[in-house]
Every structure is written in structure tokens, then in C-alpha cells.
């Protein structure tokens, strides 16, 4: 770590070569984190920004690349925290657990006025990912953006003609009050932003600019849909067009035709859109499950515009979805079978997580997650190897190496009270993808070819979503609700995977070791 160490020449070159929707950078780049005012929906507020923009710049690379992303912390607004970390959502970080970015699990935060180099390779993954602050609720204030790893040998390449910066679509909830200053559990966002623009339906809003995505009639587009949400899930659709899903959370899946996609916080889908309709403008809709849930006046909307169509807003009407996405219809393209034996409990270790809520905090197995002062990885490197020795007490579970693991998330109602209010809760596992052998809304188990992903909705009362994965990646890995306000309220645990081999598998750089002493020396006003 150092004072403003910079790859600025590389960044300048990257920016000069892009200049498209997001202004793509990477895989070697600076990423400066700073505060600035933004007005994405007609209302101005201070925000936490990556690269000075919302959403943050698209970061790209190819399968097999080494990513070297130098995060420079220039934050000055203490109401949104001056420190930061960056999590690379969906990247396995095999051998680089220290670069996973979860504050107080994998690292101490980067102090304001300092920088830290995230240096990791992506040898066997390609697809659609994203990055965000993983410190408290900071990403709700703006620090979030898309990340794409391209595959030069993409098995689906014959299905589309266009896949570039212009075909990335981000969906974000937006709040006019800083997360630390607002309610612990907001009732809903003030607006929904599609590629960083949206409309606010309240006072001071109005007909602000919306994102326009342009297509050419006759071409096939691979759109990469990324939910960078802090809370709501969205029902996404494009008037007059079906979508063919080919990728789920960085995993190729068999082609599946749908006309709407319910996408939860942290999830991603690639879909093919065939621009085979009349030259015109069509509404793109992303309706949240909380807040304003219609599209009157262009809220929750963007525009799909065919080349040569008039520069006007669409007049298309929403129709009832007839082939909505159903998670159980998604089938992985390669090696589709779930780990373990094809029967209930047919794994080396099975565990059911007991959720509860006391009005202010969420609990898993009667413990609410309170971030430790010493990161879990540092605890392991310092000699703590078993759950009894690892902090926070009761929130760290050790997992054996090279084992099959089954985790269940029962959502139950007792005496009229839901064990986890605010459902459905999307749960994200760091360091892995998993097979969803029982999905929300389903009572059956599928061990032969279940969807494989890294973020799953745990559904509503009566659901018992069940996942399986293999412990092949030593290190501490966060498992948490991706509604960021719920994570802040303790809805998380840590898997201490193969603690005995964690140190040898994850050699840490000196700069990582310097993070905690620097952070621990900060005045409370600089945290």
C-alpha cells in the first residue's frame, strides 16, 4: 500500500481507446474512489464514485488474464465513510483470497489517502460479473460497477453478432439520502437507474433523460444484465421482444427463451436479443419489488431504439408475461450434475441455516454477524484454525477440504411471523459457484442438471432452497444476504474453508499486511 501509487499512463491509454457507454478500462488500471455530486434522476446528491462516474467504469479482460487494479482512495466525506474495499463479485480468487475485498473477512479497509493493488488472475472463468464496495453499506451510495471477462473461445459465439461495452445493462436502486443517514431498512428506492439514468416520481423529478440503447435491425445482441442493487429485485423486460438466456452468474447455460427476467441483487444474466422488430422505440422496463412499482411517466425505464427510429419516447405498451424466467428451467451447458450423490443429504457435510430477526438484527443459527477487528484471513494466518478460535464467535464455520457440502435455507412462518422478514433474500457465496438442487418456489430436488450460480433467491415462506458446492478453494469465504441493509444488520456467516492449507494456498503481499496497521491508526473521523 502506498500514497497514490498510480498506473495513470495505462488508464489514459485505456480511456482514449474506449469512450463508449461505460468507458471500459482494464485489466491493468487505476480505479480512483472519490466523492462528487451526481444527478442521475433529476435530484442532486453527494455520492461515492469509482472513476468519477455512476455506475463505475466497465472493467474488462479476457479469460486467463491477470487483473491488476490499483484502487486509490480519495474519499473525503465521512458520512459515507472515507475508507473502502472492493469486492470482485463472482471471481473465485483461487490463491488470492486476500484480494476478495470483503472488509474484516479478507482484509482491513484501504485508508483515505492511500492505495491498494488488487492483483488476481481469472484462469478458468468468463462471463458477466461486477464490483462494489464491501464495507458497510457504502456501495448503496454509488460505489458499484460492471466487470466482464470475455472468452475468445465462447461456445455461444455463433448465437450473436454484437457483444461489447454498449451491450452491458446495469440495474440499480438509488436513494437520495446517504445510507448511514437514512433508515436502517428503507421502504424502497427513490428511483431505479438503468445504466445510471432514471426518473424520480416525486417532487423535483420529471422528464429527465433516460438511457437509450441502440440496435440495428437484423442483428443479434448479447446483452449482459447486471443487478447492482442494494435491495430490491427487478422484473426486467423489453416491449415486443423475447430474450434468450445463455449465461447465469458467469456460468454458460443451455439457451432458454423468456419474455421477462426476475433478477435479484448481485445476479447476472446474458441474453440474446434478436433485433427483428419494426424500426421504432421500445420501452425497457425494470420494475422493483419495493418502492414505485409501475412505469408511469418513464420511471423504472430505459429506451431500446432501432437505428433510424425517431428520437422520441416509446409508445409501446406492456403486456402480460407468458414465458417468465423460472429458475428450475436453467440447465448448465457443461458438467451439469450437482456434487455428491443424487439423494437428499448425499454429501460429506449437510447443514441447515436457522434464520431469525429481533427487530433490528438478523441472526443465523442464533448469531448476528459483527465484523471482527482482525480480518478472518489474518486470524487464520496467525494460527487460528478451528471455529472455536475464530472471531466473530459463532459466525465462522470451518469446512473440510475436497468435500461436498450441502446448505439449506428454510424460510418459515411461526405464529404468523416470518423468520426472515424482507424476503425474498438473495444469498451470495464468495469464492464459489454452487448447484441449486432445490429452488425457490419448488418442492422438488434436481441433482442431475440444476442451475449453477453464485447468488440465489431463498424465496418466501415454505421454501427450503438448497445448494451444493465442493470445497476446492482454501480460505475464508463470506456467505451473506445481498440486500446490503440486511448484511449491515448481521445477516451473514463465514466459511473457513480448509484452514490448514489457507496460508500455503494464499501467499499475501506486503501491501496487504500493511492495511491493518494503517487502518487501525486512523482517527474515528477518518474511518
Swiss-Prot record:
The protein in question is named Laccase-5
Q: Which residues are glycosylated?
A: 74, 77, 156, 209, 233, 242, 276, 317, 358, 366, 393, 402
Q: What PANTHER family does its record include? A: LACCASE, MULTI-COPPER OXIDASE
- Which intervals hold domain Plastocyanin-like? 25-150, 162-306, 373-498
Name the domain of life: Eukaryota
Q: Which InterPro entries match?
A: Cu-oxidase-like_N, Cu-oxidase_2nd, Cu-oxidase_C, Cu-oxidase_fam, Cu_oxidase_CS, Cupredoxin
Q: Which organism is it from?
A: Trametes villosa (White-rot fungus)
Q: Write the Enzyme Commission number(s) for this entry.
A: 1.10.3.2
This chain's function reads:
Lignin degradation and detoxification of lignin-derived products.
Q: Which residues bind Cu cation 1?
A: 87, 428
The protein's required cofactor(s) are namely: Cu cation
What's the catalysed reaction?
4 hydroquinone + O2 = 4 benzosemiquinone + 2 H2O
Assembly, per entry:
Homodimer.
Q: Which cysteines are joined by disulfide bonds?
A: 108-516, 140-230
Q: Which residues bind Cu cation 2?
A: 89, 132, 482
Keywords assigned:
Copper, Disulfide bond, Glycoprotein, Lignin degradation, Metal-binding, Oxidoreductase, Repeat, Secreted, Signal
Q: What class of enzyme is it?
A: oxidoreductase
GO BP terms in the entry: lignin catabolic process
The cofactor remark states: Binds 4 Cu cations per monomer.
Q: Quote the CDD domains the UniProt record gives.
A: CuRO_1_Tv-LCC_like (cd13856), CuRO_3_Tv-LCC_like (cd13903)
- Residues where Cu cation 3 binds: 134, 430, 480
Query: Where is it mainly found?
Result: secreted
Q: What GO molecular function terms would the record report?
A: copper ion binding; hydroquinone:oxygen oxidoreductase activity
